[in-house]
Amino acid sequence: MITAIVLYELPQSITRQQCLAHFHRIAPGFLEAPGFIRKQFIYAVDGKVAGGAYMWKTLESAKAFYSGPWLDCIRERYGNQPTITYFETFAVADQKDGVSYPIRE
């Protein structure tokens, strides 16, 4: 399992409310991405950066997603190149679902 942290700078013209509304509008579309597991949409408390913490089944599925139309949309909407950092996910603990489990290789 792969966790990807994606960050991009927000233009000053995009307000917190606009960012929130946009995230809510696009969230369902991620469910169709091959290899996608979960995304947490994130917004810096100072309003300067936004992005996501994604979970993917494989590194290949993550890289394929970020090199497709998604990247063009980010560049067009925010006017900058996102930073993407990939991590191997060794374990997950989730209070909401009451689970904690290791990721098997």
Segment roles from a protein language model:
Residues 52-56:
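Conserved RNP beta-strands of RNA recognition motif
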Residues 1-49, 59-67, 80-105:
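Short S/T/G/P-rich N-terminal loop/turn motif that feeds into the first structured element of a domain
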Residues 72-77:
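A common structural junction motif
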